[in-house]
């Protein structure tokens, strides 16, 4: 058995903007009430009915660090609707929806700071 993904981190220049973007897009519960304003994505508050989901963090890059991107795939009930909502919040659609295998559809976008984010819907 492989090791599961248990955390993700999305870092950018404007942490508050990114935290707001993801809270609005996916209705994530994010708590940045700490000295670093690091937004902890609450795993327990974001689980599916089957207990599926991971927690993570959204924060600001130190000034001396170059930018980058993180790719995570987020399960959504409707890839097209999620891509459209992401675009309405300032994202750039890159791909999709696209069927990759039977019952699996994906989409990819760049968030407002250029992070590559994937969306996935599976028939499981």
Model-derived regions: residue spans:
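Core segments of cupin and vicinal oxygen chelate
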Residues: 2, 9-53
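Vicinal oxygen chelate
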Residues: 5-13, 33, 61-85, 89-124
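Conserved active-site tyrosine of GNAT-family acetyltransferases
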Residues: 18-22, 86, 114
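Short polar/acidic secondary-structure junctions
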Residues: 46, 63-64, 98-99
């Amino acid at each position: 058995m492989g090791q599961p993904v248990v955390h993700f981190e999305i870092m950018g220049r404007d942490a508050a903007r990114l935290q707001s973007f993801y809270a609005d897009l996916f209705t994530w519960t994010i708590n940045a009430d700490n000295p670093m304003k690091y937004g902890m994505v609450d795993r327990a508050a974001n689980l599916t009915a089957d207990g599926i989901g991971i927690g993570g963090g959204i924060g600001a890059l130190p000034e001396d660090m170059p930018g980058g991107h993180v790719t995570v795939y987020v399960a959504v009930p409707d890839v097209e609707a999620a891509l459209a909502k992401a675009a309405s919040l300032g994202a750039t659609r890159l791909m999709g929806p696209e069927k990759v295998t039977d019952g699996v559809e994906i989409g990819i976008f760049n968030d407002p700071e250029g992070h590559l984010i994937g969306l996935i819907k599976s028939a499981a």
